[in-house]
Amino acid sequence: LNEADYVAQNIRTSKDGSSFDIYYKNNLLCNLKIQLTGKHNIYNALSVCASLNEAGVDIDSVKKYFVDFTGMGRRFQHVGSVNEIELYDDYAHHPTEIMAALDAAAVKFGKENIVAVFQPHRYTRLKGLWEDFRGAFDNCFRVIVTDVYAASEDVIEGISGENFAKTLEKAEYMSGNMQSVAQQLFPTLKSGNVVIGLGAGTITFLGKELQNCGENLLCR
């Protein structure tokens, strides 16, 4: 396919999702609405529509499935709420994935409400993509960096969550396991904040630990 055969135009986004027109060779193919936000999700939907159209499927007959689709597990997944604070979990552990996740979050909730909690995954990845990671957190007002999830790797001297946090103006370092991180983070959160855990390790348990804090006076 020529890269210009299928194009998404008139893109409209809100906290409820995205809608856009799909053009095929400059002719309107359909209007599509999805529950997801973020450019990457729009591109994904566009790719699916292109594949279906090439296979001869009537796009209008399957549009409702796009509306019903709420996303994959651990991809900007809503895992609960506590004290009017929304909790999300995302597997993103690469700079481009983090940027995509935070872009979607900012569209839905506003950059000024997003608290990103980043658990670096592997010392070698953090070292190799150090500068790329530093540029991945524009779409949030606050960044929490935890200890590195080693994934069986040996420690690399000088490469740590604490040292990485020092390179970001709006970042803070919080040490320990996810229970400890939640206990440090919870008292600093406010109603309306949206916490999104980012990483491929134990960060996935952060939402549950924050909910536990909401029920535990020791966290306040």
Regions from the language model: what does each represent?
Residues A100, G128-W130, I156-E157, F186-P187, ...:
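Short amphipathic alpha-helical segments
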Residues Y24-R142:
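Nucleotide phosphate-binding/pyrophosphate-handling subdomain across enzymes
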Residues L1-S14, K33-K39, K63-V67, S175-G176:
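Beta-strand->loop->alpha-helix junctions that form or flank phosphate-binding loops
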Residues R134-S191:
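C-terminal helical cap/extension that packs against the catalytic core
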Residues R12-C30:
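Acidic-glycine-rich active-site phosphate/pyrophosphate-binding loop
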Residues H93, P120-Y123, V148-A151, A200-I203:
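Short glycine-rich anion-binding loops that position phosphate/pyrophosphate groups of nucleotides
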Residues V145-V148, E215-R220:
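Short, flexible loop segments at boundaries between secondary-structure elements
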Residues S180-C213, L218:
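A glycine-rich beta-strand to alpha-helix segment
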